[in-house]
Amino acid sequence: FYGQTVSWYPCGATGGMERTEAEESNSFSCAMVTVPLDYEDPDGQTIQIALKKRAADGESHGSLFINPGGPGSSGVQLVETASQGIFSQDLLAGYDVIGFDPRGVGSSTAIDCGQAGPAGGAGAGQPQPGQSFEDWAQGYSAGVTALEQQCAEHSEPGLLDHVGTLSSARDLDVLRAVMGEESLNYLGYSYGTGLGYTYAELFPDNTGRMVLDGALDPSLSAEEIDLGMAEGNEIALESYVEACQAGQTGADCPLSGEVENGVQQVRDLIASANTSPMGTSEPDQQVTGDQMSQVIRGALSTARWQELTAALTPAITQGDASVFALAANQMTQSAPAASMATMIAIMCQDRPSQGDMNSWENQYEEAQEVSPTFGAAWTNSDMTCAAWGHGNEPLPADITAEGASPILVVGTTGDPATRYEWAEALAEQLDSGHLLTWEGESHCAYGRGSSCISGAVDDFLLNGKLPKDDLVCSG
């Protein structure tokens, strides 16, 4: 596998791997790489990993591999959007940027769930009024199991057992080798930080310049991650409400009183729509509180605060959820059943279920305490994995990457998804970890408009120069 020859072809900015005429390629080329389905059986079944390369605008330092997170998001797509304002011109000039779809994802050998619905039949995201937790949990779990069966039926045999991060990290080393690189230069966002530090743990001698932005803490359980995300979402909502009431989110703010009053208005809106779904401009379309919650959680970064205000204003003042409906539809279209299944499959490989009905109900109650607005949405990872299965390749909790080159960990103080303290913890756990901080309200930092962050990350990736110890970037 390490010695295979890669056949590149022009593919252009098509959003995928489609072949184009050479003159239309816009510096993009694509290829497929073969890897074993099971690294313990290298002579057995093989799968394909999709690569998309954007050639450097100037003299190339080599290959920079990128991962957008998810888990389950497409690096093939990221490599195009990265050249549209996310990555700096200096970085694009200095590296051939390589996007890849991890195993199970997108244009690689992917999980296929046939015609399964976007939610996999899992039902409501939390117990409904008058419903016991156990009754809801049983219905939810049955939906997850049905989704798993649908995906197992339509996917490559054995694929669901071999999509974990350990296997993807081994794939990444094959990709490094076939690109002719002695070491892996890598930029990973969110879940992509987990792929990065797993690679560094497995292949410290092959680890080059690595940036992990929006870090996961490898020592945490699935339950601890859920609770951390719930609390992070709640804190981010409070920051949004404060900015909204201060007139910093565009249109007139529909949230009155103090911050706690505004937060309560959002909670009341969600609860009311769960009891009686809110109407829209389309007579046959209504929006539930669960859908509103999902849209709000997806808009808690500063770059999307104006969109959030635009959705909340007609819903609160006129009882019109049309903007929420549009956003919810877009989220459903961008996250079909296969994408959701891929996220579940990777998550459950990495952190198999450890709980039972009692522990899940306790977690539900604890999540409600740390996040009265969103807690219910962050209570079911372990329960999901119990219903899904396939937890045969758990990640190690003790990650040090001993012997690896310096690794730059980037944390955002107001990150609603990957908590800042997780970045602190990862930088501390890694033998060669160094922390870079952005004082901002966003999920991940690089490419969010901070010249301080961009300059520090670029200097490290292009020149190998680490920022000064504990550098904090503002604005």
Where are these regions (language model features)?
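Short alpha-helical scaffolding segments that buttress acidic/His motifs in well-ordered protein cores
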Residues: 291-297, 312, 345
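Gly/Pro-rich cap/lid or specificity-loop segments adjacent to the active site
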Residues: 1-291, 345-475
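Short loop/turn hinge sites at secondary-structure boundaries
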Residues: 135, 276, 303, 311-322, ...
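Long, low-complexity segments enriched in small/aliphatic residues
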Residues: 322-351, 355-360
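N-terminal, charged low-complexity regulatory/assembly segments
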Residues: 243, 294, 306-307
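Short helix-capping/linker segments at secondary-structure and domain boundaries
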Residues: 298-318, 353-358
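Structural motif
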Residues: 276-293, 301-304, 333-341
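Flexible "cap/lid" loop of the alpha/beta hydrolase fold
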Residues: 216-234, 309-314, 320-333
